[in-house]
Amino acid sequence: MSIMLPINNNFSLSQNSFYNTISGTYADYFSAWDKWEKQALPGENRNEAVSLLKECLINQFSELQLNRLNLSSLPDNLPPQITVLEITQNALISLPELPASLEYLDACDNRLSTLPELPASLKHLDVDNNQLTMLPELPALLEYINADNNQLTMLPELPTSLEVLSVRNNQLTFLPELPESLEALDVSTNLLESLPAVPVRNHHSEETEIFFRCRENRITHIPENILSLDPTCTIILEDNPLSSRIRESLSQQTAQPDYHGPRIYFSMSDGQQNTLHRPLADAVTAWFPENKQSDVSQIWHAFEHEEHANTFSAFLDRLSDTVSARNTSGFREQVAAWLEKLSTSAELRQQSFAVAADATESCEDRVALTWNNLRKTLLVHQASEGLFDNDTGALLSLGREMFRLEILEDIARDKVRTLHFVDEIEVYLAFQTMLAEKLQLSTAVKEMRFYGVSGVTANDLRTAEAMVRSREENEFTDWFSLWGPWHAVLKRTEADRWAQAEEQKYEMLENEYSQRVADRLKASGLSGDADAEREAGAQVMRETEQQIYRQVTDEVLALRLSENGSQLHHS
């Protein structure tokens, strides 16, 4: 993740009047980096990396970004003054000794199998999507760890300062003691069979919300003190084989009128489903008529080893057992047509496999909600690829549906907070399913299995519909102007306008951004606060993009809609 402005791509060391003096001062660094550059493997952008390294050292920058350069290694001597190092989306298999001053390390999306000793000053560690089997000793000041999507089998002792720990999709079988400082924990998709005692804070702000996400494990036991947590705490235990006794006990205790403990979410079933998956090609061909199955099978055999293929196969089998599959006319044909599109687009297939990987085998309505999301993925992909380039009205309709679904998700999220005992999937699906006709939601299934236990009332639905229509009237055009598929259309069909808008944005970055961020921090009394600076920077950037993209959106829509008689605003 980037936390600084893009570098000046026109920077040239040869143009720097005091380069010779500087290069003498840092001769050892420059010599080592030049030697490292000459050892580049094919495809590595080490020349750009060295330019960035020298610029950082000469200017004594505190931040160094070497993202997306296809680097297989880093030089042994990094600039010693840096506090922030970003090296994401490379091909790194190891890291050199890290600067003693380092506070922020983002090394996600690499091939790291080990980490070096971490500096004592480190506060933020992001190593998502690597090949780590263990973490080194953790610094005492560390506040944030993201080690999702690795191969961790155990964790070291956690520092007492730790506030965020995310280790989703690993192979953990147990957790160490959790520190009292912890505010967010995500250990979803591991092999945990139990949880340690949850830290109970004696003193913390009532505004601090604490989240423990432990879904998709093998948890059969929960700590005895779990109900002693504050109402500001949320614990997600869905898709774990909790015994019926524990589920009944949780249900009874959290339903008491005087209950003031945490919000606890767990699945209605015990999760003891058969986890054997049949071959992907077999699961796919089952959706097609017999005269097509042989050809379809040959095509899909080629995708058997793609990431998430097994879970996608299981998802298709569970989808065939949903209420919609059993009762909705034309549903099988709809799924078959969608599968044909997936077979011809590797990008769409990859996206869809990833979405389906989040579906559980133990909850029918989660499968139904995932099907909704997959249909959204298809439509957004088609829009981004140009399907609606010549049909602005259809693109607006699609955007309007995506906007309505976003608002419903916000409403569902707020509703979930009011319920102690609930499978949140039922709440999200209830709003989409029950309002599908009134809000013209083409991607939503028309039936769900557990609406009766969703906690969503008729009054909730009426209020939600009114809120969606009100926010659509006031916010849709601003939202649409920032929508990715619309930007893709503008780049292809309005190249000159798009280029002008981008030029405006970068002029603002160069001439106004820093001052506007500084003014905002000064007004709020937060000058020098790094977190506040990042937040203020994001706000300024969004406001700028909103203004610039809204202007070009208004111009293009006014022209196109006047030509075909369409309207931007309708119910």
Curated annotation (Swiss-Prot):
GO CC term (a single one): extracellular region
Key words of the record: Host cytoplasm, Leucine-rich repeat, Repeat, Secreted, Transferase, Ubl conjugation, Ubl conjugation pathway, Virulence
Linker: region residues: 269-278
Highest classification ranks of the organism: Bacteria, Pseudomonadati, Pseudomonadota, Gammaproteobacteria, Enterobacterales
Post-translational modification: Ubiquitinated in the presence of host E1 ubiquitin-activating enzyme, E2 ubiquitin-conjugating enzyme UBE2D3 and ubiquitin.
NCBIfam families: IpaH_Shig (NF046045)
GO biological process: modulation of process of another organism; protein ubiquitination
Annotated catalytic residues: 363 (glycyl thioester intermediate)
Protein name, per record: E3 ubiquitin-protein ligase ipaH3
All residue ranges annotated as the NEL domain in the record: 279-571
Entry's localization field: Secreted; Host cytoplasm
Catalytic activity: S-ubiquitinyl-[E2 ubiquitin-conjugating enzyme]-L-cysteine + [acceptor protein]-L-lysine = [E2 ubiquitin-conjugating enzyme]-L-cysteine + N(6)-ubiquitinyl-[acceptor protein]-L-lysine
Species per Swiss-Prot/TrEMBL record: Shigella flexneri
GO terms assigned for molecular function: ubiquitin-protein transferase activity
Effect after changing residue 363 to A/S: Loss of ubiquitin ligase activity
Annotated region described as E3 ubiquitin-protein ligase catalytic domain, given as residue ranges: 279-571
Family as reported in the entry's similarity comment: Belongs to the LRR-containing bacterial E3 ligase family.
Family annotation (Pfam families): LRR_TTSS, NEL
Region: Interaction with target proteins, residue numbers: 1-260
Assigned EC number: 2.3.2.27
Role of this protein: Effector proteins function to alter host cell physiology and promote bacterial survival in host tissues. This protein is an E3 ubiquitin ligase that interferes with host's ubiquitination pathway. Synthesizes a 'Lys-48'-linked ubiquitin chain, which requires non-covalent binding between ubiquitin and the host ubiquitin-conjugating enzyme UBE2D1.
Domain characteristics, as noted in the entry: The LRR (leucine-rich repeat) domain forms a slightly curved solenoid and may mediate interaction with target proteins.
Major localization listed first in the record, in broad terms: secreted
Segments annotated as LRR repeats: 58-81, 83-99, 100-119, 120-144, 146-159, 160-184, 186-202, 205-229, 232-260
Enzyme superclass (EC): transferase
